[in-house]
Amino acid sequence: MSKNLEGKKSPNFSGECTSETKFKLSELNKNLVLYFYPKDSTPGCTTESQDFRDLYKKFLKHDTEIIGVSRDSLKSHENFKSKQSLPFELLSDPDEKVCKAFDVIKLKSMYGRKYLGVDRSTFLINKDKKIIKEWRGVKVKGHADEVLDAVINLL
């Protein structure tokens, strides 16, 4: 069972991102949509990232930044970001420090084989670094719209 982080202070984290940037939550003066996804360039992850891309300007109007996180390498992230024209950065978490801080590593099963993977999850963090809303086990369809609604109604 995942720990519920809603209403709690966000874990402080930093990491290497696309565009040769380093992200530090402590230095962000905006709200943040932090979405975790299993793997670059896979169907669900591509659709989810495109949906956030298409709504990005609306998130910015509400002083909210978006960061995508997966265990993929920076090179993989750069290719994915470029191919999908993503206007926001992707954080590379190969050692799973950020994934573990948000408790999104789960035992999964595919074709009868069990493995540890990223549970598609999103966290809405306000300017005070408090987690206002969390979504775990996300279904991609309509998710970015639901997150935008939360930004509009909860922040």
Predicted features, each with a name:
Residues 1-155:
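Chalcogenol-based redox active-site neighborhoods
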